[in-house]
């Protein structure tokens, strides 16, 4: 849980410490060792993931024949991180305690994030690096928006409870940091909004909707506080020419649907669209239809994409789905899309429970942000995402949804 917390709080700042990969390797050994005591999840969703893991192993072998082993293995983690979903079987006897630990990680996420963000603005503290050349407090604001949504959804669903006035303080910090994140990331902003809309639309809980109405009373105060913060708190522009502010948030939102006067926003959108179009062309209409380009090569170099290197080496097209298409080809791409559709179509199930809805909406936030950024290709996004997927698989396979296990989780939440 400590390692998971570090990836949630710090993200890319510890990505090159390879803690997640080491944990995955150790967990896999333990899973093999305890295999006789564990029931294999054989739901259709799980079987699709097993298939992707097997295919990925073959692609890794194929890639090492032509490219360096380390580059191939690194690219192969796009699906290797799926293993985290099944490592949760090691905690099957204490799954409720495991879930409670995740709630606790997010209970004070907004507060800790706010402190870390303020510290990152200090020249000395903000420049500290422990792993590679990435600053320890290097924030990817799309990732932050996803975690803020999780913190928010845990609060309004009652999974995390707060004494007054901490409930209001937490809401203020969530939306304050969401405003900051929205200044830098359009994808993250939309991930939060879209996932919340889906949650509200499909929630059948009268209690949750009543709690939301109570929180809406504070909305004007929260908005005023956020606007004042954005208006008075001045931060230098980032490498994309974006700075914290109300105008920047507005420009980011309008640039999604229209062409703005901000050249950086337009350029950032154009190079993505051009790259995505090239991938679709050489797979669906080109020589990489069946097998893709494989693992081990840099897609940016091979596709002749010219961008700045201010975020480090660029290997993937800022879209998880199209990364799969480019590297694995059309067949694996459609298998992946089929898995995603299976996850989402459960929203229409009449037996949809509160926890099931929450876990699906969390997956929506992750997947949407991953459609505009390099997120699930690395441990900072993939580790927590596949943990949530694993919880979903376990609760569905063992029949814990709408059962005493789910009821106990909601009853055991404390202030």
Write out the residue ranges for each language-model feature:
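Long extracytoplasmic/lumenal interhelical loops at the membrane interface
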Residues: 262-328
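N-terminal signal-anchor transmembrane segment
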Residues: 1-36, 54-66, 78, 116-119
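Alpha-helical transmembrane segments of multi-pass inner-membrane proteins
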Residues: 99-126, 138-206
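Hydrophobic transmembrane alpha-helices and their immediate junctions
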Residues: 305-308, 327-366, 401
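Membrane-interface helix-loop-helix junctions at transmembrane boundaries of multi-pass membrane enzymes
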Residues: 32-47, 157-170, 207-216, 341-360
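Transmembrane alpha-helices of multi-pass inner-membrane enzymes
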Residues: 25-28, 153, 358-415
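A membrane-periplasm/extracellular boundary helix in multi-pass inner-membrane enzymes
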Residues: 182, 203-262, 281-285, 295
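Aromatic-anchored transmembrane helix interface
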Residues: 43-60, 66-91, 105, 110, ...
